[in-house]
Amino acid sequence: MKKEEYLEKVALANLWMRAYYEKDEPLASDEEYDVLIRELRVFEEQNKDEISKDSPTQKIAPTIQSEFKKIAHLKRMWSMEDVFDESELRAWAKRAKCEKNFFIEPKFDGASLNLLYENGKLVSGATRGDGEVGEDITLNVFEIENIPKNIAYKERIEIRGEVVILKDDFEKINEKRALLNQSLFANPRNAASGSLRQLDTSITKERNLKFYPWGVGENTLNFTKHSEVMQFIRELGFLKDDFIKLCANLDEVLKAYDELLALREKKPMMMDGMVVRIDDLALCEELGYTVKFPKFMAAFKFPALEKTTRLIGVNLQVGRSGVITPVAVLEPVNLDGVVVKSATLHNFDEIARLDVKINDFVSVIRSGDVIPKITKVFKDRREGLEMEISRPKLCPTCQSELLDEGTLIKCQNIDCEDRLVNSIIHFVSKKCLNIDGLGENIVELLYKHKKITTLESIFHLKFSDFEGLEGFKEKKINNLLNAIEQARECELFRFITALGIEHIGEVAAKKLSLSFGKEWHKQSFEAYANLEGFGEQMALSLCEFTRVNHVRIDEFYKLLNLKIEKLEIKSDGVIFGKTFVITGTLSRPRDEFKALIEKLGGKVSSSVSKKTDYVLFGEEAGSKLIKAKELEVKCIDESAFNELVKE
C-alpha cells in the first residue's frame, strides 16, 4: 500500500467511525470496518514513521452525541485488541510473554456499561463513551431488573459489563416496531444501545435488558487473579454465563473457542467472539496498556454473520395462498462458510420501510437455519445507478392481475401453477398428511409431467405414472404408493391443517376437530368465533373457505379414512389446570410431551410469564429458562417431569 492509499483509507475509516458513533447511522458492516482497520495496522507496523495522527488506530472512538449529561469514569474503560485466527492469537500471547493460565468467557455483542456503587448502593450508570467520559444513563439503569440496586460490599467500586437483548426479545421488539411502522433495529446490539439511551425510562424497562459483568474499574479488592474478582462480583448478585473457563495453555484456549463457536446459534444472546485474558493480575499490571488496548487481554473474534454486499435484483415468489413475496438477489457473499445469494424482503411495505433499491449496498445477516435477511441499506454509498423496486401488477407465474391489499399482494388465480405446487407441497408435509418420500422436488417433477394437478390427484396415482421418470425404480415407486395409501388413514386435524386455510394452523385445527368432528366445515360464524382462542379474523377465514370448498371437503371424505382424536382428560392429577412451557432438547419430540400434558389436563404455552406454572427444560435451553428463573417459575428437567406425571 502506498502512502496516498493509506491516507485515503484513514479518511474512509474516520468517516465510517463518525457515522457509527456520532450519527448512529453505520455506513459499513462491522466486518468491513474490521478489515479496513487491519489494513491500516499492517501499513503502520511496516511504516512506523508515516503513521497518521488521525488514524483510528491511534485514538478512542468518539462519544455518541446525545441529550444525556456526561459522566467521568473513575478509571478508563478500554477497548480490546481483536485477533481473528490461531496465528494472531499466538502472536498476541507472544507479545504478552504469557502462554499459560488464561481466563476466557463469551464476548457478548451488546453495549458496554459502567456501574458505580458506594456504601453498597448503586449511585450511577454510564455508557463507555470515549473511555474516559460516558453518558449518564442512571435512571435507565435502574429499570434493568437484573442489575442489583444494593450489594453486600460497602467500598466504592466500578463494575463493568455488557448490556444485551436476548434474541427472542429482539424479534418481538422489531415485530412491534413494524406494526407501528417504525424503523427496525438492524441487530440486537443496536437495540441494546438504543434501549439504554432512551429519554423515556419506561421504554428501557419494557425492553427486558440483561447485564452480564466482565470486569471492574475503580476498586479496593485484594485478589491476585481475575477469576477470583469475577467470582466475587457474581456472588454479589450479578448474572453469570454458563461458559466461563480457566485454560492452562493456548491449546486449551483454542479448544474452548471451538466449543463456544459451536454454541453460537444456541446461545440466547448474540456473541461475536471470545474474551481471552491473562488471569494473573500482577502480570496484567506489569504488562500495562497501549494507546488503545490492555496488553493482557484480546477479543478472539468469530467469523462474521453479517456482511455487506450489493442487491442486484428482485425475484417474486408465489406462495400457496397466493401471497407474493419479494426475494432479494445478491452478489454472492460468504457468511460463516455458507455462500448467500439471496435474502428475504418479506413484503413491499418492508421494501418501502428500508428504502432499498436495486444496486444498493446492503448489510445481510444470517443466523443458523434462518433465511438470510437484509438489516441495513447504506444509502450514503449510492452512486446514482440505483433503481426503484416497483410493486408488481401481474403475477410472475400466471400473469393474472394481482390484488394489492397494502402489506400483502396476492394472486387470486386458484389455478396458478406456483400456488398449486406449493399447496401440494404443504398438503403432503410432515405436519399435515406426512407422506414419506413425496418431497418438494418430487412434487415439482410430478406436476411438471401432469401426473398430479390437484390435491385429490395424489390419491389417484398409479405405478404406471412413475414409469419412465428419472430416478424412479420399482422399489421406490412401491414405497411411495404404500406411503400414499397409509396417508389415507389420517387424523382429522392433520387434514384440516393440510388444507392451508389462512390463519388456521395445527392448534386451531385440533380445536375444530375436537369441537365439531367431521361437521367442522358446516358451522356458523358465531360457532367458530366462540371457540377458545379464535377471533373474528379466524372465523371469517373459515366461513369464506368452507363456503367455497364444502363440496370438495365432502369429496375428500370419500378418499380418506379420517380419524377423530378424542381427548380424554384426567381431571384429578397434579398437572390438571397447570400451564407448561417446554424448552431445550429432550429425549423425545416435544409433541409427545405436549400431548401427555394435555391428556393430563394441562396446557402448553409458547412463552414464559408469571402465569406459567412449570418450565420443562432439556439440554441447551435458552432464553425461556433464563426468564423463568427471573420470574421464579418452577423449572423441572425430564426426570422431574416423569416423577410429576406419576403422581
Curated annotation (Swiss-Prot):
Tree of life domain: Bacteria
Signal peptide span: none
Parts forming coiled coils: none
Protein's UniProt keywords contain Coiled coil: no
Keyword line: DNA damage, DNA repair, DNA replication, Ligase, Magnesium, Manganese, Metal-binding, NAD, Zinc
Cofactor(s) required for function per UniProt: Mg(2+); Mn(2+)
Catalytic residues as annotated in Swiss-Prot or TrEMBL: 107
Every BRCT domain range: 570-647
RNA-binding in keyword set: no
Record-level GO BP terms: DNA repair; DNA replication
Entry EC number(s): 6.5.1.2
Family to which the UniProt record says this protein belongs: Belongs to the NAD-dependent DNA ligase family. LigA subfamily.
Stated name of the protein: DNA ligase
Organism: Campylobacter jejuni subsp. jejuni serotype O:23/36 (strain 81-176)
